[in-house]
Amino acid sequence: MKTNVCKIALMFLIGTALSLLFNSCSKDPVIPENETDNKLHEDPSKMTIRLVECHLHADWNEIQKVGGPHQNPESPAKHMKRIQEITYELKAGKGWRLAEGSQSKFYVQKNGDYYTYGKYTPAPVYLMFIYYYNAKGDLMNSQFIENGQDNIHQHFFTPENVKPTFDGQPEADDNEPQKLVDYLYVDTTPWDKTKHSKEAEITGDSNPIGLKGVIRFLKDRKEFDLKIRLYHGYKSKGNPETRSEERR
């Protein structure tokens, strides 16, 4: 079985300082609020990333409109579980650390290129969910959505430190992210409902947040870190003054 190993690296970004640099070039610079003091949400104390192996019932390129990923049945393979989770906790004086008992890596497969009745249905693909918890242990995802917070929050996913597994070979384009992973935002409104249940619409294309996404892996025999950045801006994601490099 041709597999990849994916670890998670975390980064939380506040947009104010970055945007201050941008605004300093304008004739009449705007002085933003200190977003560190006025985030309008709690700081997370725990984060869980859940990866669910799926197959498709729709064209990959239509997922953000119609949905389509369906969970695969469980596998007896030791490392190839259909549902995998990695959990980090914020430790005093140490920052984000792997939670006790959490797995440290995701084991994933390169997708095969398949077509079903003319539709592009690569498999496997993986649904990726992110859950945040406050210091009390309460789920706090809604705090990044409600009261307009969805307009200034977005996750970004970047593979880094790519290297071959013990049985793989380095390739010239290993460090080109688009050659390694393909990610689509499939956030929903409401955020905690699904299109399959007919209780929500998929809005990840128009309002990408990254609490829900679908990812596929384009190479095999690779090991890498998936850097996850949660960006908190002081202006809407759709504002042209938002720094483009932070939206990649």
Placement of each model-derived feature along the sequence:
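Short beta-strand segments enriched for Tyr within beta-sheet-rich domains
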Residues: 123-128
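N-terminal edge beta-strand
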Residues: 78-119
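Extended, polar beta-sheet/loop recognition surfaces of beta-rich domains
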Residues: 138-196
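Short, hydrophobic beta-strand segments
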Residues: 197-221, 233
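Conserved small/polar residues in nucleotide/adenosyl-binding loops
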Residues: 246-247
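Short acidic/polar inter-strand loop motif in beta-rich domains
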Residues: 135-141, 233-241
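Bacterial Sec-dependent N-terminal signal peptides
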Residues: 2-5, 18-49
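N-terminal leader/pro-regions and domain N-caps
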Residues: 36-92
